[in-house]
Amino acid sequence: MPSPTERAAHRTPPAALGAFPDLFVDYCTDFDAVADFYPGDWQSRPARRAAATAAAKRPADREVLADTLLDQNERWGLDERTRSHIETLRDPDSIAVVTGQQVGLFTGPLYTIYKTITTLQLIEEWADQTGRPVVPVFWVEGEDHDFEEIAAAHVLQHNEVVPLSYEPGVDDNPGAVGRLALTDGIQDVVDRLDEALPPSDFKPAVMEQVRAAYQPGTRLEDAFARLMRSLFEDDGLVFMNPDDARLKALTRPLFRRDIEDPRASVAPVNAAGRALRDRGYHAQVNAHPTNLFWLGDDGRWAIDLEDENAFRLRGTDRTFSRSDLLNRLDETPERFSPNVVLRPLMQDHLLPTAAYVAGPGEVSYFAQYGGVYDWAGLDMPLIHPRASVSLVEGKVQKVLDKYGLTVADFRDGLEPLFQDVVVDTMEVDVDALFSEALPQLHQTLNALKPEVEAVDRTLGASTEATRSAIMDEMEALKQKVVRAEKRQQDEVRAQLKKAHTNLRPDGTLQERTINVLYYLNKYSPALLDDLRHALRTDTSAHQVVGV
C-alpha cells in the first residue's frame, strides 16, 4: 500500500469516463459555456468573496440555528472543535461551506465520503480568500420517502460485489425515512458486513464504530450521523438535520410564499429547463406546484395545486384549502417538507451558505434554480463540484500496468475491452498459422509422391497414409494451440474482470456503488486523512488514487 507521502491523485478528464452529464462536464471544464445558468465561477476568487458577503447576511436566525445544532450534535457525539464551529455560526461575519446527502446505509456509496472530504478541504481555502470564519456543515437528508434508495450498501469480497440490504418491511411510503427506528434486523445486516469484510488489523475498530452507530431502536438518520461523526471525529464537521420543528419554524416564510403563489416558484425552474434543452443539455427537473410535501402519520405526500384555492395530497383524496394549509403551517411547520427544488432554498435560508459541494446530478439541478432563488429573495451560493475519485488497489494497478490500461479504458464495459486487449496481446493467429502451413504440407507431399512411386509404385498408398497421419497430427497440434490460447484468454478475461469489478462495479463508477468501509477495513481508517492530502480542491477532473 502506498504511504501517504507516495499517494498522489492522477487526473482524468471527466468526459473520458463517459459517466457524467454533458452539463456537468462543461461546468467543470468550460465554465463560460454554462455561466448563464449559475451565480458565478466556482473557482473565481472575486466570485467567492461576493458569495461570502451575501451569505453572511442571509441566516434567518443565527441564535436559534446554533442552539438547535448544539442539541442535535449532542446526540451524535459533540466534540470541542464541532462545538466551537457551531458557536462560530453566531458570529454575523461567519459563513459556511455545506454539503449533504441522504442517510444511506453505513454512509452509502463512496461519494458521500468524497463530498465530505471536499467540504473539509475548502474550509481553510475559503477562510484565506475571504478573511471570514468558515464552518463545515453536513446536511443530513432524512426526509425522503424512497427507502429502497438508501437501504443497501455494497462492499467487495473476492473481487465480487456483495450487496448488504436492510429490509425492515416498511410500506411503499414510510414517510420521512430518517425517522424510521432500526429493527432487530439491523443486527443481521451488520453481521453480514462483518462476514463480508476480510480479517485485518483494522477490522475490530471499524466494526466497533458500525455496531455503536447501528443499533436497534436508533433512528436511521441518527445512525448515519453517528457513523459519519466517528469517521470524521477530529474535523469539527457540523451535522444538521432539517427535520426539526425549530428549523421548520424558521422556514415558515419560505414555505408560506410557496403556498400563497406556487406557480411563481415553479415557473423559473421550468423556464431554465427549457433553456437548457435549447442549448442541447438535459433538464434535471420538471417542477409542479407546489414544491412541498406533507409529512403525515401515514406517509410523505406531495402537495399538488388542484385549482386556485385547493390543494390535494398526491395519490389520495385528501384536500386542503389555501387558508387551511397556511393555518397548518403556522401551527405545525414540522409537518411540511421541501421537495428537490425548495430543499436547497431551505438550507440557504437557515445557513450562511457561501458554497455548496455538489455531486454531478446536483450541479445539473442548480442550473435550473437561479430564478427560484430570486423568487425567494436569496442569493444562490457558489456550487463546487465534489471530488470524483477512483481508488486503485495494487492488485488492480498490476492489471492496468500489464495491459497498458487506464481507468478511462473501462468506460464501455468488459467485453469490448477484452476484445481490444486480446487483439493486442495474442501473439499467434491460430487459424491463419495453420491455414498457411497446411497447403505447404500438401504441396510438399504432392511433390514427394511421384518421386516415391518412381522407386516403388506400391509406396503411393503409403504416401497417402502418411498424408492422412500428418493431417491428423496437425489437427491435434492445432487443438493444443487453441486450448493454450484459450487458457491465456481466460487469464486475460479473469484479470480484466477483476479490474472492471473494482473500478466499474455493475457498470457504474466505483464511487457510486462501493462503501467506504471496505477500504477502511483493508487499508486503515487513516485512509481518509491520506485522501485529504492526496486529493485536490480543483475538482474539475476525475482523480485516480492508488491505495
UniProtKB/Swiss-Prot annotation:
<keyword id="KW-0175">Coiled coil</keyword>
<dbReference type="Pfam" id="PF10079">
    <property type="entry name" value="Rossmann-like_BshC"/>
</dbReference>
<dbReference type="GO" id="GO:0016874">
    <property type="term" value="F:ligase activity"/>
</dbReference>
<feature type="coiled-coil region">
    <location>
        <begin position="461"/>
        <end position="504"/>
    </location>
</feature>
<keyword id="KW-0436">Ligase</keyword>
<dbReference type="Pfam" id="PF24850">
    <property type="entry name" value="CC_BshC"/>
</dbReference>
<dbReference type="InterPro" id="IPR011199">
    <property type="entry name" value="Bacillithiol_biosynth_BshC"/>
</dbReference>
<comment type="similarity">
    <text>Belongs to the BshC family.</text>
</comment>
<dbReference type="InterPro" id="IPR055398">
    <property type="entry name" value="Rossmann-like_BshC"/>
</dbReference>
<dbReference type="InterPro" id="IPR055399">
    <property type="entry name" value="CC_BshC"/>
</dbReference>
<protein>
    <recommendedName>
        <fullName>Putative cysteine ligase BshC</fullName>
        <ecNumber>6.-.-.-</ecNumber>
    </recommendedName>
</protein>
